[in-house]
C-alpha cells in the first residue's frame, strides 16, 4: 500500500525544520492520543527521513513497521502517549536534539496539526530539575527605529535579583 497524507505531512515538516535547525532535529507529531515519530527504510535496509533509530534508543521506544510505503520505501513508526510528553522532552534534549512538537486540533469534521513548541537544549527549563535556580530575572528589549533616515537598533537590558 502506498503512502497516506499523514506520512507525507510528517516528512515535509521534518525536512523544513531539519533545514532550519540541523540534523539533530526530531518532529513529534500528535496523532490522536499519541505523539508519533516516523522514518523510512529503503530496500538496502538503510533508515532515513528522520532520526527515529537514534531517538528510540535514547527514549527506549520500540520501532514498528507500518504496512504502508512512501516513495516505495517501508514506513517505520514509534511513539508514546500524549500525557508522557514532559517525560520524554528532557531525554530528547539530553541527547542534544531539538524537539519540534506539532499538536492536533479539531477543525470541522477533521483535524489540523499546528506547531505547539520547539524545545532545544538551550531554551528548556525542566520543571522537575533538582538543579538550583537563581532568583534573577532578565528582560531584553530590542527595537529597530529610524533616526534621521537611518536604521538604528536600540537594545535595552535589565536584570533584577528578586
Labelled PLM ranges:
Residues 1-162:
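Basic, polar low-complexity surface loops/patches
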Amino acid at each position: 500500500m502506498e503512502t497516506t497524507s499523514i506520512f507525507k505531512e510528517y516528512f515535509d515538516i521534518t525536512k523544513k525544520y531539519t533545514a532550519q535547525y540541523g540534523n539533530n532535529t526530531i518532529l513529534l507529531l500528535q496523532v490522536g492520543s499519541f505523539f508519533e515519530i516516523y522514518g523510512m527504510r529503503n530496500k538496502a535496509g538503510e533508515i532515513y527521513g528522520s532520526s527515529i533509530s537514534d531517538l528510540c534508543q535514547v527514549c527506549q521506544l520500540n520501532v514498528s513497521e507500518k504496512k504502508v510505503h512512501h516513495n516505495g520505501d517501508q514506513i517505520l513508526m514509534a511513539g508514546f502517549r500524549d500525557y508522557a510528553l514532559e517525560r520524554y522532552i528532557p531525554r530528547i534534549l539530553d541527547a542534544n536534539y531539538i524537539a519540534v512538537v506539532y499538536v492536533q486540533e479539531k477543525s470541522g469534521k477533521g483535524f489540523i496539526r499546528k506547531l505547539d513548541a520547539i524545545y532545544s537544549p538551550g531554551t528548556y527549563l525542566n520543571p522537575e530539575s533538582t538543579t538550583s535556580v537563581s532568583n534573577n530575572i532578565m528582560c531584553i528589549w530590542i527595537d529597530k527605529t529610524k533616526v534621521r533616515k537611518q536604521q538604528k537598533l536600540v537594545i535595552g537590558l535589565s536584570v533584577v535579583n528578586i
